[in-house]
């Protein structure tokens, strides 16, 4: 759904972008993540709880399934349009529902036509969120059930980011660009803030 008047009116801009609901007490057929590119109005990405990822490049008039080569039937924990490259998009998937703790992290540089696995040296832990650094395009931040990680080479390798952080799942990340702060939302252990100004200077 889309509203152009702050929520007063809503218009459907898609058909069902999932595989459809299933019987039982565990929700299926639900969109879990949506993002719009800052480079183009109407360049939209969605992810669902049954592993479907779709892209629309015309404000929802047409949608393309871009998840055919991704692992099947996993929870799309985050889909993120790049703030540095128009065609780049990231997807993280979570397999906890199947007792699968593999870290699933993918990047595409062609609107999702093909994907590169960038989980590399991450330990076994479900991945909940990925963010780009707003100042340094080589830096990525990741929140997992095993804590936070950062990459200085676009996901080729990952480093633990744990100083001052308890051993806890990180469910969300956001960056306050002006003050150069990374904010981490954890599972029951409050919100943490980290100064990332020194990290942003690493090339």
Per-range role (PLM):
Residues 1-203:
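Beta-propeller blade termini and top-face loops
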